């Protein structure tokens, strides 16, 4: 499998330094992608870089994932208009361990193969590096003129950020350049890959290697992922879509991919899955014949959810989706954990009832008309119940005055009322 050709048909090449393809054709290459460790989970904004490493390893090359412990303590001017918070070492090590666990779902760290993946942290070689070392081994090789010419620096200096550009952030490209030099010298790493906004920082590294060692190193960047409508990829109203289920439930994760537009699904299935070209071309053709069936979105959501979470989590997410949009049973509803239940019914009207009152038993008509405004009147409710149009926890309400107790609660806390086909209400016992 040819790595560059694989990335090209997937739309994952933005810039590539001349000679990169020739290098990859003649030897097993070691390359790295940098990962920001400011959180203890990756989010889907990291996935393009991770998938590049995955394809790289599948093509027989050796991937390094570099945790930017030292650089993460500083900040990067290439895309952030504001400086980042600093990390302490304990937090950094915790975040690193969590991130490696997530990366292990994409990369082989464990085998004895010569191209097994490695995780490195630039804090390990920067923490003892003095300012005098830095000035002598890095600073003297790169001119300020060279640094000022970088697009990311120009933007900050030209007033895009009110606070200007600190010296710390200005030197970021030298620190990242030194990472490349260090990995070149210690790991034989000849290629750095990253998002297109990193081109300036990466080429500082190739320049540093050339000027200090007379060595040849290379750069490859992928496009920044966008949405067809111009919106920011990977962000929702509630923030990032995280890989850690503590921050984004598998159900919400699955729903994110399921709900992308047709145009985005066609691009994302190439970038975020390992499906081969023939299969993806077949899926696109099938989708174009019947877009309303959302074949691409369903397959994309399945592949990414299984890869990041598990087959079991994927099946649970599908079942949860069917509760809202299909003919699910009360048994399926009862299987939902509290987080998924709340995620599925996010935004539906909510009402509260006293747990004590419910323990004694409350007639449905009193609960749904007087306590919770599910119905405007008892007459309206009676008519709908008689027509089989009212359900409690996905079971048809048997009678207008059916008694509801704490035994009916889901997760010992919730009652789900459905009026007609599409109107849901959540009653919370407190």
UniProtKB/Swiss-Prot annotation:
<dbReference type="InterPro" id="IPR001412">
    <property type="entry name" value="aa-tRNA-synth_I_CS"/>
</dbReference>
<feature type="domain" description="S4 RNA-binding">
    <location>
        <begin position="362"/>
        <end position="429"/>
    </location>
</feature>
<dbReference type="InterPro" id="IPR002305">
    <property type="entry name" value="aa-tRNA-synth_Ic"/>
</dbReference>
<comment type="similarity">
    <text>Belongs to the class-I aminoacyl-tRNA synthetase family. TyrS type 1 subfamily.</text>
</comment>
<keyword id="KW-0547">Nucleotide-binding</keyword>
<keyword id="KW-0030">Aminoacyl-tRNA synthetase</keyword>
<dbReference type="InterPro" id="IPR054608">
    <property type="entry name" value="SYY-like_C"/>
</dbReference>
<dbReference type="GO" id="GO:0005524">
    <property type="term" value="F:ATP binding"/>
</dbReference>
<comment type="subunit">
    <text>Homodimer.</text>
</comment>
<dbReference type="InterPro" id="IPR024107">
    <property type="entry name" value="Tyr-tRNA-ligase_bac_1"/>
</dbReference>
<dbReference type="InterPro" id="IPR036986">
    <property type="entry name" value="S4_RNA-bd_sf"/>
</dbReference>
<dbReference type="GO" id="GO:0004831">
    <property type="term" value="F:tyrosine-tRNA ligase activity"/>
</dbReference>
<feature type="binding site">
    <location>
        <position position="176"/>
    </location>
    <ligand>
        <name>L-tyrosine</name>
    </ligand>
</feature>
<keyword id="KW-0648">Protein biosynthesis</keyword>
<feature type="binding site">
    <location>
        <position position="172"/>
    </location>
    <ligand>
        <name>L-tyrosine</name>
    </ligand>
</feature>
<dbReference type="GO" id="GO:0003723">
    <property type="term" value="F:RNA binding"/>
</dbReference>
<feature type="short sequence motif" description="'HIGH' region">
    <location>
        <begin position="37"/>
        <end position="46"/>
    </location>
</feature>
<dbReference type="Pfam" id="PF00579">
    <property type="entry name" value="tRNA-synt_1b"/>
</dbReference>
<keyword id="KW-0067">ATP-binding</keyword>
<feature type="binding site">
    <location>
        <position position="32"/>
    </location>
    <ligand>
        <name>L-tyrosine</name>
    </ligand>
</feature>
<keyword id="KW-0436">Ligase</keyword>
<feature type="binding site">
    <location>
        <position position="235"/>
    </location>
    <ligand>
        <name>ATP</name>
    </ligand>
</feature>
<dbReference type="InterPro" id="IPR014729">
    <property type="entry name" value="Rossmann-like_a/b/a_fold"/>
</dbReference>
<comment type="function">
    <text>Catalyzes the attachment of tyrosine to tRNA(Tyr) in a two-step reaction: tyrosine is first activated by ATP to form Tyr-AMP and then transferred to the acceptor end of tRNA(Tyr).</text>
</comment>
<feature type="short sequence motif" description="'KMSKS' region">
    <location>
        <begin position="232"/>
        <end position="236"/>
    </location>
</feature>
<protein>
    <recommendedName>
        <fullName>Tyrosine--tRNA ligase</fullName>
        <ecNumber>6.1.1.1</ecNumber>
    </recommendedName>
</protein>
<keyword id="KW-0694">RNA-binding</keyword>
<keyword id="KW-0963">Cytoplasm</keyword>
<dbReference type="GO" id="GO:0005829">
    <property type="term" value="C:cytosol"/>
</dbReference>
<dbReference type="Pfam" id="PF22421">
    <property type="entry name" value="SYY_C-terminal"/>
</dbReference>
<dbReference type="InterPro" id="IPR002307">
    <property type="entry name" value="Tyr-tRNA-ligase"/>
</dbReference>
<dbReference type="GO" id="GO:0006437">
    <property type="term" value="P:tyrosyl-tRNA aminoacylation"/>
</dbReference>
<dbReference type="InterPro" id="IPR024088">
    <property type="entry name" value="Tyr-tRNA-ligase_bac-type"/>
</dbReference>
